[in-house]
Amino acid sequence: MKILLLILIAYLLGSIQTGLWIGKVFFHTNLREHGSGNTGTTNTFRVLGKTAGTITFLVDMLKGTLAVLLPIWLGITEVSPLIIGFFAIIGHVFPFFTGFKGGKAVATSAGVLLGFVPLYFVFLLLVFALTLYLTSMISFSSITAAVVGLITLATFPAIHFLLDGYDPIFSAVLIIIVLVIIFRHTENIARIRNHRENLVPFGLNLTKQNPKK
């Protein structure tokens, strides 16, 4: 019963669409009607500005971290914290509060890693930041970090200092997270191939922006 309650709490926590509510409450703007129509960090940055975008990213990330830490704080050892964190990701992608139309899982997934394997989170964050600096594309940077996560998982002996050891649950959850992130970025991948992906005002690739209207 405790585990089911934790899963429900994590899912509902993940279902909170931070960018959407910030837009409606403070800007009287529905993110679904502007930019890409997504309620995640990137579109929030683009439509509502840096402050709203930063808050959205931090809150969405902390949803995952909090979900992972809940069973640890409560002393519940019958279930892996990763499983609880995973349901926060599911809530973020398929939120009950907004008709099961949510974000792309990146920030909340990052939060899950932060709560469970902080050094690994820092490593992938550096990969994300470097890729973003080189390409100015958040979508490509997110996909790259996700794929690098899989590669490093497959080559564990080379990065053993980042992880305590092989964990079947961690491996399974990470693989699913990567697949979800790639699936949720299908449209972005198509725009990247056509050189039409939206850029952000950061990094080296700022002169080729051709945003989707």
From Swiss-Prot:
Its main location: membrane. It is an enzyme of class 2 (transferase). It is found in: Cell membrane. One of its GO terms (cellular component) is plasma membrane. It is a multi-pass membrane protein. Belongs to the PlsY family. This is Glycerol-3-phosphate acyltransferase. It comes from Streptococcus thermophilus (strain ATCC BAA-491 / LMD-9).
